[in-house]
Amino acid sequence: MEDNFRNVLIILSAIVITAIFIHGLWTLRKQKNPYKLKTSKDKADPITRDFDRKGFDQDGVGQVKVKPSAENDKINLENEAVTEHFITEGIQLPDDLSKSQIIIKNDVLGDLAGQTSKAKQEELDNNSIQELDSSLEDDWFKEDNSGQFSKGELGDELTPAPAVEKVKKKPTKPKAVHIEPLYEQPVTQAKPARTPINKVSKTPSKATLKRDQIEIDFDNQMSEQAAAPKKIKTQLEPQVIILSVVMPANQQMLGAALLPSLLTLGLKYGEMNIFHRHEDNAGKGKVTFSLANIMNPGSFDLDNMENFATRGVSLFMTLPNAGDPFSVFEQMLNAAKQLAQEFNAQVLDDKRNVMTKQTEQHYLSKIREFDRKSRIALVE
C-alpha cells in the first residue's frame, strides 16, 4: 500500500513540474523578452538655456562656434567640378548618390565613358590642381609675412664679409724630444726592510719533555703504592636454608618405608651418617643439599633402618652452593613436598611455621640477595 501511494505521489509531482515548466516557456514566448528594458515612447524635451548678451548661459558656458575647415571647401569644389563634368557629357546620375561617392567613382566612370576627349580630361586635371593649390593658401596654413622690419630693429646695414680663402696646411710630424737623464746610473727604489721573525724551534720542548720523563722517580711511586692500604676483601658468612618435614602428633616415620623414598629422591648415605644429594644423579660430584634426622643426634643407623622410627626429617642447603642456588632450592623443596605427601606430614620453615607461597618467595629473595652480595665481593 505504501509503495502504491509513493508511486502516485511521484507521478503527480512529475506532472506538476512539467506543467510549471511549460507555463514558463509559454509566458516567455508571449512576452518575447521580459528582461529587456522598455524604452519610453515619450521623448525627453531638451533643456532650454537662456544666453545673455555676451553669449553665456547661467552656468557660464558659451555657445558652440563651428569654423569651416579647408577640407570641406576642397571637397565642395571637387564635387562641383565632377558634377559639371557629368552634366556637360550628358550623363544622368541617381538622386540618392552622394557627392563623395561621385568623387570616389570619378576615375572608374571616366575610364568607362570612352566619349570624353583627352583635352577635357586635361582641363579637369588642371582645374583640380589649381583648386588644391588655392586650398593650401587657406588661413589655417598661411603665415603673415607682409610685415617688414625697421632699420632700428635690424640695425646698421650689413656689409658682406670678405671671402676667406681656405689654406691647406701640410701635416707636420712631431719632433722627438730627447731628455738627458739627471743621473748617470738609473736609481732603483729601495725595498722596505723586513722585520726579523724569530722562529720558535720545537726541539727545546721535546728536550724538556724527555728531561721530565728522565727525572721521574719510579722508586718513589712504587713506595707510595706500597704504602697505600690494601683493600681487604669482605668474606660473606655462609647461610643455611632449612626445611623440615614433621609428622602429626602421636605419629612417626618408619625407617623401612623412609629408606626407599630417600633413595628414589636421589639421596645417598654418606658423611656424618646422613643422606646427601650430589650434583650427579649417580651420587658423584659436590653436595648440593643434605637430609638429617630431626631427632638428636640427627644421624641415621643404616644397619638398623628396619627398626628405625622418627618424628620427622630436616633438609638443608648452604650458601654459597656448589650448584645453582635457585635450582638446588627447587629440588630440595620438591623433595620435602614429596615426603610430606607420602607420610601425611607437613612442610615447615626454619621457624617451624607451615610453609606457604609467601615463605617460598622470602627464601628466593634471600638467595637472590646473597647472590648479589657475592658478585659484588668478587668484583672488589
From Swiss-Prot:
Protein role: Essential cell division protein that stabilizes the FtsZ protofilaments by cross-linking them and that serves as a cytoplasmic membrane anchor for the Z ring. Also required for the recruitment to the septal ring of downstream cell division proteins.
Single biological process term from Gene Ontology: division septum assembly
Gene3D superfamilies according to UniProt: ZipA, C-terminal FtsZ-binding domain (3.30.1400.10)
Name of the encoding gene: zipA
Segments in the Cytoplasmic topological domain: 29-380
Record's subunit section: Interacts with FtsZ via their C-terminal domains.
Protein's recorded name: Cell division protein ZipA
GO cellular component, as recorded: cell division site; plasma membrane
Ranges of the Periplasmic topological domain: 1-7
PANTHER family: CELL DIVISION PROTEIN ZIPA (PTHR38685:SF1)
Membrane topology term: Single-pass type I membrane protein
Major localisation: membrane
Localisation per UniProt entry: Cell inner membrane
Family indicated by similarity: Belongs to the ZipA family.
This protein's UniProt keywords: Cell cycle, Cell division, Cell inner membrane, Cell membrane, Membrane, Transmembrane, Transmembrane helix
Transmembrane segments annotated in the record for this chain: 8-28
